[in-house]
């Protein structure tokens, strides 16, 4: 029915037939429906009409009661209503009536609310009294009657005689106060300008100006506002300025005298024009009658011309300066700024010279330092100053959180709030050029890409911030962990028991309390610790970064540790990983890579060496020197005497090991002496020759000695972030510290009166040689000294000392003069021998000739391995780092080390292209097992698959050049050991290196190699390791079974033991990977090192062959009890089986468990280079299965400062640790734990290349000779220059730093440096370098990577083709 009701046809037709005739019968229901519908409609119509009428009548009634005054009140109230506020914005506020006991309290409020310009007219004003006079005329206190109430106001009256200009000025001054309505801005209630005199009616503030109020309170201390009130007032002033700026107004005279205070102590910016009269002393009146608020005005607004003071218009940044002074004035209760200085002094010192700054207010405030920090922000340069909004945000936060938030939490949030991204200062914040610390911010060029990650609630801790800075040298990744502290070295990672044991092992007695461990390479840090993972675009050579099993066992490293030289080099290389510190004298090594404070703060090295005696010494020493090192302070002692060889000891007998503080002291002394003597990295530096004495010309240094970076490079032991080559080597730190100091190695050099050579290993050889004894003792001594100095430092491999051999190292002879150039700081009495040794060491470094690199498998696996890798790199990669050409072989060694990645970075094909030297590569005979991968730094930053980590095929035999340099005609009577230096390209497995630290190390190595290679020409008396430079970069020089390990010198000491061993050999006991030639038996006789052309500076990386105990060398490395002495020289199994006196750093006696794996493992690791190398790098040293007679060697980290030792121990876990612990570490292998401010610089392998900029322009001009194929590098001409291999050209491209591996062809693991001590031994051809894939950086805070930053540089692309391109070309100059 309902439907029918609404059907018109039915409704109207239902009662009619189709014709319209009415139906006789009507349905009753239908009728009712029709009626109901009708009534409903009628009712609806009536309701609508009534509604309309009611509405109309209501409106009419409202109008009837409307009147003008009421309308205004309504309008006024409407403006304050929420709806209106929403429409008009926040500029208009209805101020609540303040409930104050004072009778006048409500008056101002009501006047603000109710008085309108229409209400206020001349007729409604009642003058009460005159309160002052201004430039315009009189100021009166008046009262306005608005009908229902009255309110007090201030009336400014313009004098009737005012000119039109004055009239305009009078009205303009009040414009902001009329247009803006804000609780912290004085309001102008009305202006009466219809007739003269002009009147301005201002809001009345009963307490007057803020300055007068505070001064009165200061007199009556009981009335002084409490600090919280003052802080609130400061926020209100900032809020008022912010509102002005948002509306494009600036205050021309911001100061407390121009801020007024209401009855409820609310601050309002504004004035009545009485300041000039009341505070005459606050103004400097010029001859032109300009009133200048000199003590508040920003310096850029004032200028002086012909004794006339000129003032420009105020700016927003100028207001911020004045705001800072106003806040200072507030906290000083109205004290005039610079109260002790006259206006002229303020003008001279504050305005003109900008030297005088206001001191911190004496008022005791919560977070007073932060308040003062904000003030200082306001006084930065105009472009660096925070905005008013930033200042207000900071002050508001300080007020709100200062009293309630825990200090630690506050600090974290504070950094995130600071203008400019918060934090250059906090590694994380790094952003604000203005606020990161006046200096930090000013100099900051960081881009806080990850600022959002520091936002509230992103991290529970919020302590970590990663700042990525794009620099000419590459990307700087600054990551700071604030939550952790040195006290909790392994909080999340280790169980209490393990932690205690670890510290006991790693931080022997006397070790600094703090430990900064590089726990494991694999697992992300547990808990709140973070690790940085460098991911490779494509896996390189199937390298599995996480494959711990692939990495050579730490024990192998131990054996390598025996090789002092290698170890030393490795430790230098590791040093950057452990904490590159710019060299002490670093101009170039800026602490950027590793903040010194970080080291200083971090007694990181508690886990210094497995050996309690040696470990504490090396690490403990590092603590003191860490400051010098910055983070690089691995083992300052190591750097001082990384090889354990001390310039101090010249006698055949090794110096007694120093223990504890004694060792530290001696290390310090040696270091000082060494610094004086060594400019370039001594054996300690991974860049065996890369360090040049400061005296060297930066360019010449870069070009002359691979191991000797240019002076400016030298200072910066670690390359700039953009300087991958330099920083990679621990050397950089050493160099930076002292022009004449090779960290760790200087001892070696100084020994025997040999001038401390810049070469890394040279000191051991030099010392050995200088000891002049055929006593292996001399070598052991070097090792021992290094140990003593560095504690866990690996002794330099016992290299037949020139004196032992009775013949100077040939290669060094020529560079004796060069040596002075290279080592101006260090006398080179036995320059020939020393230089030769250095060169040899450099070559060995570059060519992984020194097993010591591997040696660092003992002690901390991470530290040892990293150190080992570093040393390996130092000996091999160190040279590599210094000489990309040497890198391949060293890479093998590097892989052994936890740091090897950095060494891998050092792997810079410098070995391949180094000065024409072919790298001695055990892989020449066979692939170095763990080299490719073992080099992983253990930092997750490194991705082995990353192109950076891709070993480039050795297309250039840089190392041979280095070796040739080393071998280059030494005048020494001792037979030259000829090392076939052609280095085979690193296996693709080897191409990996840690981009983060290793790239730094590598850069350092590269930079070092460049300069040092130049030095290679010098020959040192005594046997030289001649590294025939094979033209073929792919060639690898292998140590002859009989030859390698010993210099074939007359004395066993001459043996260049594992020194030649490839990095490939993992931290395994044997330095040389199986691919390497078997360890040479005791020297069969003086081996002639083929002299190679050497630049003016000689590479001073001397690897001291450590006579195998089995061989019964007269002496073993003597060192601290912890040092691995006799056993340290371990046979390298890599060769045919002839035991080779391993070059090793004497470390504190480590248990056999520390021994590195046998070379076999190295080979195995070569097979799984990536994994093995990584394992070697990260795994705690385990007794190597293959280490038969090899005593576990603890890698010696060569550091300029003793604090470096700490880093070393952290990087390498002592093999003493239980297998369980080692396993745990391996499980966490990829975790890098920092418990202090840590700056991590991640560089793409290629990114540090010249494209990123030339850290050392001079170096660029003169690329390392090895790169150039300088005469110092015999093989330079023969083998492709590394630079050529690298798209960027020579390693020197990086401003004297070596190009990254990507720049150089990556060497295959097989290309691990093998040294053929036998001159006749041909060097195997190095595999053609494989293009390095682009690498990308993934920063992983926590197991899951929060963000991934991919940085692909042109050099990366170049590097891909670089290995191939570089195969035959000479190194290019950056």
From Swiss-Prot:
Compositional bias ranges of the Basic and acidic residues kind: 1353-1363
In-chain residues carrying the UniProt-annotated modification Phosphoserine: 495, 1029, 1168, 1171, 1184, 1187, 1262
Polar residues bias: start-end ranges: 680-690, 865-878, 978-987, 1063-1073, 1272-1291, 1337-1352
GO-annotated cellular components: membrane; perinuclear region of cytoplasm
Reaction catalysed by this enzyme: L-seryl-[protein] + ATP = O-phospho-L-seryl-[protein] + ADP + H(+); L-threonyl-[protein] + ATP = O-phospho-L-threonyl-[protein] + ADP + H(+)
InterPro entries: Kinase-like_dom_sf (IPR011009), LMTK1_c (IPR042817), Prot_kinase_dom (IPR000719), Protein_kinase_ATP_BS (IPR017441), Ser-Thr/Tyr_kinase_cat_dom (IPR001245), Tyr_kinase_AS (IPR008266)
Tissue: Expressed in brain.
Domain Protein kinase: residue ranges: 125-395
Composition skew (Acidic residues), residue ranges: 1158-1173
Comp. bias (Low complexity): 606-620, 719-731, 801-831, 847-856, 900-914, 1138-1155
Binding-site residues for ATP, renumbered to this chain: 131-139, 156
A GO BP annotation: neuron apoptotic process
Biased segments, Gly residues type: 1365-1374
Listed Pro residues bias regions: 1321-1332
Annotated compartments: Membrane; Cytoplasm; Cytoplasm, Perinuclear region
EC number: 2.7.11.1
Modifications after synthesis and translation: Autophosphorylated. Phosphorylated by CDK5.
Residues the record marks as active site: 253
Induction: Up-regulated during apoptosis.
Top-level lineage group: Eukaryota
Entry GO MF terms: ATP binding; protein serine kinase activity; protein serine/threonine kinase activity; protein tyrosine kinase activity
Region (Disordered): 542-622, 667-731, 765-1195, 1245-1302, 1320-1374
Membrane topology (UniProt): Single-pass type I membrane protein
Subunit structure: Interacts with CDK5.
Family to which this protein belongs: Belongs to the protein kinase superfamily. Tyr protein kinase family.
Record-given protein name: Serine/threonine-protein kinase LMTK1
Species per Swiss-Prot/TrEMBL record: Homo sapiens
């Amino acid at each position: 029915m309902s439907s029918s009701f609404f059907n018109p046809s039915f409704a109207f037709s239902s009662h009619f037939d189709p014709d319209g005739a009415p139906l006789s019968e009507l349905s009753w229901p239908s009728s009712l429906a029709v009626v109901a519908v009708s009534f409903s409609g009628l009712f609806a119509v009536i309701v609508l009409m009534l509604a309309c009428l009611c509405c109309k009548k209501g409106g009419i009634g409202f109008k009837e009661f409307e009147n003008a005054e009421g309308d205004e009140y309504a309008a006024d109230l409407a403006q304050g209503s929420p709806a209106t506020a929403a429409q008009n914005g926040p500029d208009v506020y209805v101020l609540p009536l303040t409930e104050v006991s004072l009778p006048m309290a409500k008056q101002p409020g009501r006047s603000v609310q109710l008085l309108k310009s229409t209400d206020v007219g001349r007729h409604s004003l009642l003058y009460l009294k005159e309160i002052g006079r201004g430039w315009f005329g009189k100021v009166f206190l008046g009262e306005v009657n608005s009908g229902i109430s009255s309110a007090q106001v201030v009336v400014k009256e313009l004098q009737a005689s005012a000119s039109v200009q004055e009239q305009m000025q009078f009205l303009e001054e009040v414009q902001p106060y009329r247009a803006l309505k804000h609780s912290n801005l004085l309001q102008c209630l009305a202006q009466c300008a219809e007739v003269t005199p002009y009147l301005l009616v201002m809001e009345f503030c009963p307490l007057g100006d803020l300055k007068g109020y505070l001064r009165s309170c200061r007199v009556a201390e009981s009335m002084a506002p409490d600090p919280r009130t003052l802080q609130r007032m400061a926020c209100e002033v900032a809020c008022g300025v912010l509102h002005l700026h948002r509306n494009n107004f600036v205050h021309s005279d911001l100061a407390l005298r121009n801020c007024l205070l209401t009855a409820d102590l609310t601050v309002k910016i504004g004035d009545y024009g009485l300041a000039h009269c009341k505070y005459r002393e606050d103004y400097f009146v010029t001859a032109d009658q300009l009133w200048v608020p000199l003590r508040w005005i920003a310096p850029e607004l004032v200028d002086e011309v012909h004794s006339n003071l000129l003032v420009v218009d105020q700016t927003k940044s100028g207001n911020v300066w004045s705001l800072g002074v106003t806040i200072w004035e507030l906290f000083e209760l109205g004290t005039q700024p610079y109260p002790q200085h006259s206006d002229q002094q303020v003008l001279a010192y504050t305005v003109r010279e900008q030297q005088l700054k206001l001191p911190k207010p004496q008022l005791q405030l919560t977070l007073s330092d932060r308040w003062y920090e904000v003030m200082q922000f306001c006084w930065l340069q105009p472009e660096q100053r925070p905005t008013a909004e930033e200042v207000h945000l900071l002050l508001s936060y300080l007020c709100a959180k200062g009293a309630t938030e825990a200090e630690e939490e506050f600090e974290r949030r504070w950094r995130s709030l600071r203008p400019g991204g918060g934090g250059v200062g906090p590694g994380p914040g790094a952003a604000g050029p203005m606020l990161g610390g006046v200096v930090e911010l000013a100099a900051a060029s960081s881009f806080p890409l990850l600022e959002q990650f520091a936002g509230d609630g992103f991290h529970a801790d919020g302590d970590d911030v990663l700042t990525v800075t794009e620099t000419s040298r590459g990307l700087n990744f600054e990551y700071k962990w604030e939550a952790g502290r040195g006290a909790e070295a392994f909080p999340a990672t280790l169980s209490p028991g393990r932690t205690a044991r670890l510290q006991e092992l790693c931080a022997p007695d006397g070790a600094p309390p703090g430990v900064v461990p590089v726990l494991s390479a694999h697992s992300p840090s547990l808990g709140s610790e973070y690790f940085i993972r460098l991911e490779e675009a494509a896996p390189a050579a199937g390298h599995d970064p996480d494959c711990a099993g692939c990495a050579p066992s730490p024990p192998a490293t131990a054996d390598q540790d025996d090789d002092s030289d290698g170890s030393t080099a490795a430790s230098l290389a590791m040093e950057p990983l452990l904490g590159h510190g710019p060299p002490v004298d670093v101009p170039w090594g800026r602490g950027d890579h590793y903040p010194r404070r970080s080291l200083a703060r971090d007694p990181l090295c508690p886990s210094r060496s497995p050996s309690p005696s040696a470990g504490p010494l090396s690490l403990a020493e590092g603590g003191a020197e860490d400051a010098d090192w910055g983070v690089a302070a691995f083992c300052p002692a190591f750097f001082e005497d990384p090889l354990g060889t001390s310039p101090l000891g010249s006698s055949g007998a090794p110096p007694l090991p120093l223990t504890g503080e004694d060792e530290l002291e001696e290390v310090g002394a040696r270091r000082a002496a060494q610094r004086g003597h060594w400019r370039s990295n001594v054996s300690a530096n991974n860049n065996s020759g890369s360090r040049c004495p400061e005296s060297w010309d930066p360019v010449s240094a870069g070009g002359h000695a691979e191991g000797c970076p240019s002076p400016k490079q030298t200072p910066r032991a670690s390359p700039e972030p953009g300087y991958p080559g330099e920083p990679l080597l621990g050397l950089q730190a050493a160099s930076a510290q002292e022009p004449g100091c090779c960290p760790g190695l200087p001892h070696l050099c100084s020994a025997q009166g040999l001038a401390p050579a810049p070469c890394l290993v040279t000191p051991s050889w030099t010392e050995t040689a200088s000891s002049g004894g055929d006593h292996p003792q001399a070598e052991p001594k070097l090792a021992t000294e290094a140990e003593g100095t560095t504690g866990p430092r690996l002794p330099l491999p016992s290299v037949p000392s020139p004196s032992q051999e009775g013949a100077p190292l040939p290669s060094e002879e020529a560079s004796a003069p060069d040596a002075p150039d290279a080592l101006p700081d260090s006398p080179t009495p036995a320059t020939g021998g020393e230089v030769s040794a250095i060169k040899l060491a450099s070559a060995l470094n570059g060519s992984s000739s020194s097993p010591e690199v591997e040696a660092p498998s003992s002690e901390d696996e991470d530290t040892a391995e990293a150190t080992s890798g570093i040393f390996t790199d130092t000996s091999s990669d160190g040279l590599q780092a210094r000489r990309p050409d040497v890198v391949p072989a060293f890479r093998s060694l590097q892989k052994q080390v936890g740091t090897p990645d950095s060494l891998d970075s050092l792997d810079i094909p410098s070995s391949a292209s180094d000065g024409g030297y072919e790298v001695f590569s055990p892989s020449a005979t066979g692939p170095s097992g763990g080299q490719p991968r073992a080099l992983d730094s253990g930092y997750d930053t490194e991705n082995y698959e990353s192109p950076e980590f891709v070993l480039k095929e050795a297309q250039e035999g840089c190392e041979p050049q280095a070796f040739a340099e080393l071998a280059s005609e030494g005048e020494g009577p001792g037979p030259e050991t000829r090392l076939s230096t052609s280095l085979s390209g690193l296996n693709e497995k080897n191409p990996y290196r840690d981009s983060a630290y290793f790239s730094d190390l590598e850069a350092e190595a590269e930079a070092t190699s460049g300069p040092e290679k130049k030095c290679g020409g010098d020959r040192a008396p005594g046997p030289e390791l001649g590294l025939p430079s094979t033209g073929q970069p792919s060639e690898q020089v292998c140590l002859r079974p009989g030859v390698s390990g010993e210099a074939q010198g007359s004395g066993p000491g001459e043996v260049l033991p594992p020194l030649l061993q490839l990095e490939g050999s993992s931290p395994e006991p044997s330095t040389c990977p199986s691919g390497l030639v078997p360890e040479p038996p005791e020297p069969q006789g003086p081996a002639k090192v083929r002299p190679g052309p050497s630049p003016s500076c000689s590479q001073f990386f001397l690897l001291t062959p450590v006579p195998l105990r089995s061989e019964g060398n007269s002496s073993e490395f003597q060192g601290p009890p912890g040092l691995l002495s006799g056993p340290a020289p371990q046979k390298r199994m890599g060769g045919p089986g002839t035991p080779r006196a391993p070059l090793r750093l004497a470390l504190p006696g480590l248990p056999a468990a520390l021994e590195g794996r046998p070379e076999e493992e190295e080979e195995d690791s070569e097979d799984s280079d990536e994994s093995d190398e990584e394992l070697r790098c990260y795994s705690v040293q385990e007794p190597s299965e293959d280490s038969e007679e090899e005593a576990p060697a603890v890698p010696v980290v060569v550091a300029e400062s003793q604090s470096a030792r700490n880093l070393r121990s952290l990087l390498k876990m002592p093999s003493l640790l239980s297998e369980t612990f080692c396993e745990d570490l391996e499980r966490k292998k990829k975790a890098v734990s920092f418990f202090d401010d840590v700056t991590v610089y991640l560089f793409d392998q290629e990114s540090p290349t010249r494209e990123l900029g030339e850290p050392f322009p001079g170096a660029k001009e003169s690329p390392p000779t090895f790169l150039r194929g300088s005469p110092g590098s015999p093989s330079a001409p023969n083998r492709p220059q590394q630079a050529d291999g690298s798209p960027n050209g020579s390693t020197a491209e990086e401003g004297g730093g070596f190009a990254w591996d990507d720049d150089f062809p990556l060497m295959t693991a097989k290309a691990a440096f093998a040294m053929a001590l036998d001159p006749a031994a041909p060097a195997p051809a190095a595999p053609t370098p494989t293009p390095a894939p682009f690498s990308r950086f993934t920063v992983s805070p926590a197991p899951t990577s929060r963000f991934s930053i991919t940085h692909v540089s042109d050099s990366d692309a170049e590097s891909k083709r670089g290995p191939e391109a570089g195969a035959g070309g000479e190194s290019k100059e950056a």
